[in-house]
């Protein structure tokens, strides 16, 4: 059988195969850099190979609070069920040892009414009734159908023990639920940070800036901001320090170093000789393996609990030569905040060199500002010339349209032979 000929020419197939072989190898996308603090404020750290797990049980209350909600609710339910079942078994054993169960089984009708003074617990005939009595004792429901008598001192001991255990379980579990609902990090959900940080010139100095705001009307009392740079460093002895933390001072004119977070604020750090960013230029920033961690702490006005909000900025999230736009305006005697522009930035003139080079050569800043002013003036000239050209073109088009709309004059003869001119 003859083979079917291909519809595609063989020359085209060979050329296509050769072209695919000559293609450059595909470069994999660069993996995202690991960060210690996520944008949401969670710590991106995994604990492995912990041998002494029993240390968590030494502080059982904190362990219960730190658990997830589904685990906490399961433990909450199981603690009550297990205590009810445990004491139900004890009540059934007390009734069984005293012979109350056999007494209820042997006698019936009017004879059972005489047993109320001789049994330990009235109306406990089976394990089900013992379980119901255990719930009534611990939760203090008090239906009245089952009650204790003075016949069994052991039953009195079990009653006291169950009350003590029930109070302990209520205190621990209800306190755990309350602490989980009133945790301080819940308040931090309404404390927001700008997605990007910027580096620009302010008051003649290069500054690292970011914006922070509070969405609630209730204030954060004694709010303070701390900034740290975390990066990998190598000592002169060759030791590699994977987590090297360096504090960054915050430029705050208030001596107490607290901020009044009534409206979104731009937190500024002046890049000077004390700053870890002093030797970093715009070109070096893209290759830097650093992370700027921001910590906002304060006291919640309504609850008095100390709260903390965190975020971080890696090198890719720091915009050089940008500035935050203004979002606070005054409208009819009231200050208004437009949160839709919370993280918006605009490009501004900023030298691309490091702060060290800027201190050594202050003329760089003057030249940058002059170039920016010239480019701004040129853009204004171009804009004005474009406006003039557009207006001239518009006027010319209007004139042409008016000339085309002029009404022509028509001449016609009257019966007397005179010519009259009229416009149609």
Curated annotation (Swiss-Prot):
Top-level taxon: Eukaryota
Intramembrane segments: 127-138, 139-145
Topology feature Cytoplasmic, residues: 1-69, 177-424
Record membrane topology: Multi-pass membrane protein
Molecular function (Gene Ontology), one example: ATP-activated inward rectifier potassium channel activity
Compositional bias annotation for Low complexity: 387-404
Bilayer-crossing regions: 70-94, 155-176
Modified residues (Phosphoserine): 6
Tissue: Predominantly detected in fetal and adult heart.
Gene Ontology biological process terms from the UniProt entry: adaptive immune response; apoptotic process; atrioventricular node cell differentiation; calcium ion transmembrane transport; CAMKK-AMPK signaling cascade; coronary vasculature development; defense response to virus; determination of adult lifespan
Extracellular side of membrane: 95-126, 146-154
Site entry: Role in the control of polyamine-mediated channel gating and in the blocking by intracellular magnesium: 170
Entry keyword annotation includes Nucleotide-binding: no
Keywords: Disease variant, Ion channel, Ion transport, Membrane, Phosphoprotein, Potassium, Potassium transport, Transmembrane, Transmembrane helix, Transport, Voltage-gated channel
Keyword Transmembrane helix recorded: yes
Localization (cell): Membrane
Motif Selectivity filter mapped to chain: 140-145
Catalysed reactions, as listed in the record: K(+)(in) = K(+)(out)
Function: Inward rectifier potassium channels are characterized by a greater tendency to allow potassium to flow into the cell rather than out of it. Their voltage dependence is regulated by the concentration of extracellular potassium; as external potassium is raised, the voltage range of the channel opening shifts to more positive voltages. The inward rectification is mainly due to the blockage of outward current by internal magnesium. This channel is activated by internal ATP and can be blocked by external barium. Can form a sulfonylurea-sensitive but ATP-insensitive potassium channel with ABCC9.
Protein family membership: Belongs to the inward rectifier-type potassium channel (TC 1.A.2.1) family. KCNJ8 subfamily.
Related illness: Defects in KCNJ8 may be associated with susceptibility to J-wave syndromes, a group of heart disorders characterized by early repolarization events as indicated by abnormal J-wave manifestation on electrocardiogram (ECG). The J point denotes the junction of the QRS complex and the ST segment on the ECG, marking the end of depolarization and the beginning of repolarization. An abnormal J wave is a deflection with a dome or hump morphology immediately following the QRS complex of the surface ECG. Sudden infant death syndrome: SIDS is the sudden death of an infant younger than 1 year that remains unexplained after a thorough case investigation, including performance of a complete autopsy, examination of the death scene, and review of clinical history. Pathophysiologic mechanisms for SIDS may include respiratory dysfunction, cardiac dysrhythmias, cardiorespiratory instability, and inborn errors of metabolism, but definitive pathogenic mechanisms precipitating an infant sudden death remain elusive.
Protein name (record): ATP-sensitive inward rectifier potassium channel 8
